[in-house]
Swiss-Prot record:
<protein>
    <recommendedName>
        <fullName>Protein YtiD</fullName>
    </recommendedName>
</protein>
């Protein structure tokens, strides 16, 4: 949340790119979670 507060301190012309960065960071965390889920699923199927 500290990162989002820093993004809100950007000049108005950069606020849209700040939002894009925020969504991109959320997406990377989501993809890490799903890839970890599929990896554990494949290991479970192999064993």
């Amino acid at each position: 949340m500290a990162d989002y507060a820093e993004i809100n301190n950007f000049p108005p012309e950069l606020s849209s790119s700040g939002d894009k960065y925020f969504h991109l960071r959320n997406y990377s965390e989501y993809s890490e979670y799903t890839s970890g889920f599929f990896l554990s699923l494949m290991i479970f199927i192999k064993s």
